[in-house]
């Protein structure tokens, strides 16, 4: 196994049995923390095998070119979504990850209520792909400009290593502490960023307001990660799941169904949202579900 570079110590790491309270404390302090062994190796291997055909068939480059959002995505980068329909491991194991929800609940519940997926996607970087510019993910929301210091974050990201993340193959770079910067600080320079080396199954938990960007892949093999982008149910997701066949959705747990928008949510004030008329979506639709197997 490849040895992790020494600069990885700039981003703190926690073991799989670390309490949610300790994880959240580090997240609030630095904006990013590595969760070691977030997924076991069997889960990583199953997911890798299930997504391979979709990755192979997908054309590299940006999926869209929005005005005012400057995020460099080259032809050697593939961002592949629709994972609920593609991967059984994703919809049954990853969306139900207990450690993940034990962290997300206290981050979202007191301030917003329920949360769901903004988007789940595989980030695949081919050899020769240059480094991505440093950016913040929460620029999606105009309301981020209204946030005050200490306000809860609107987006929580979990980037899971499907392959190794190393300096030479495009390990994501972060600027710890930059989540509390205001706009007067400007864009950080590359020398302010620390790379985050990961082994398959490790994950990076980071807030949407943190400056970060994928590194350059100077190796002879691709680098692959799974990005789970999560936000309150108040916000419209980037990725809709209404097209996912009902037979697939009904094979999922209630929690996983809510994560993809097939169930109604509740705000922090116990106000129901995403209703079907005056009733919960799942009740009106007669939606079935399965418990964790």
Curated annotation (Swiss-Prot):
Enzyme class of the recorded protein, top EC level: oxidoreductase
One protein family per Pfam? PhyH
- Superkingdom of this entry's organism? Eukaryota
- Applied use: Compounds in the chrodrimanin family such as chrodrimanin A or verruculide A exhibit strong inhibitory activities against protein tyrosine phosphatase 1B (PTP1B) and therefore, they could potentially be developed into drugs for the treatment of type 2 diabetes or obesity. Furthermore, chrodrimanin B, the end product of the pathway involving chrodrimanin A or verruculide A, does not exhibit the PTP1B inhibitory activity, while it functions as a potent blocker of insect GABA-gated chloride channels.
| InterPro entries documented for this protein | Phytyl_CoA_dOase-like (IPR008775)
Cystines in this chain:
none
GO BP field: terpenoid biosynthetic process
Q: What does this protein do?
A: Dioxygenase; part of the gene cluster that mediates the biosynthesis of chrodrimanin B, a meroterpenoid that acts as a potent blocker of insect GABA-gated chloride channels. The first step of the pathway is the biosynthesis of 6-hydroxymellein by the polyketide synthase cdmE. The prenyltransferase cdmH acts as a 6-hydroxymellein 5-farnesyltransferase and produces the hydrophobic metabolite verruculide C. The FAD-dependent monooxygenase cdmI further converts verruculide C into verruculide B.
By what name is this protein known? Dioxygenase cdmA
**What organism is this sequence from?**
Talaromyces verruculosus
What is the phylogenetic placement of the source species in the record?
Eukaryota, Fungi, Dikarya, Ascomycota, Pezizomycotina
């Amino acid at each position: 196994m490849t040895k992790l570079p020494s600069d990885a110590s700039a981003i703190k790491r926690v073991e799989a049995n670390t309490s949610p309270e300790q994880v959240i404390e580090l997240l609030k302090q630095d904006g990013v923390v590595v969760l070691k062994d977030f997924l076991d190796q069997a889960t990583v291997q199953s997911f890798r095998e299930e997504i391979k055909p979709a990755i192979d068939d997908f054309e590299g480059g940006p999926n869209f070119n929005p005005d005012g959002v400057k995020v460099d995505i080259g032809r050697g980068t593939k961002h592949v979504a629709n994972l609920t329909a593609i991967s059984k491991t994703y919809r049954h194991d990853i969306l139900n990850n207990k450690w993940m929800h034990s962290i997300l609940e206290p981050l979202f519940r007191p301030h917003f209520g329920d949360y769901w997926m903004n988007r789940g996607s595989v980030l695949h970087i081919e050899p020769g792909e240059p480094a991505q510019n440093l950016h913040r993910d929460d620029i999606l929301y105009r309301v981020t400009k209204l946030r005050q210091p200490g306000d809860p974050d609107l987006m929580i990201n979990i980037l899971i290593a499907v392959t190794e993340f190393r300096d030479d193959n495009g390990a994501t770079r972060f600027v710890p502490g930059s989540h509390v910067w205001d706009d007067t600080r400007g864009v950080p320079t590359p020398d302010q960023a620390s790379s985050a080396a990961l082994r398959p199954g490790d994950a990076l938990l980071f807030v949407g307001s943190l400056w970060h960007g994928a590194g350059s892949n100077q190796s002879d093999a691709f680098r692959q990660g799974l990005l789970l982008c999560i936000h309150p149910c108040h916000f419209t997701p980037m990725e809709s799941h209404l097209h996912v066949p009902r037979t697939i959705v009904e094979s999922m747990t209630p929690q996983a169904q809510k994560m993809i928008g097939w169930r109604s949510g509740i705000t922090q004030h116990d106000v129901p949202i995403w209703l079907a008329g005056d009733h919960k979506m799942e009740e009106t639709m007669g939606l079935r579900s399965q418990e964790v197997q």
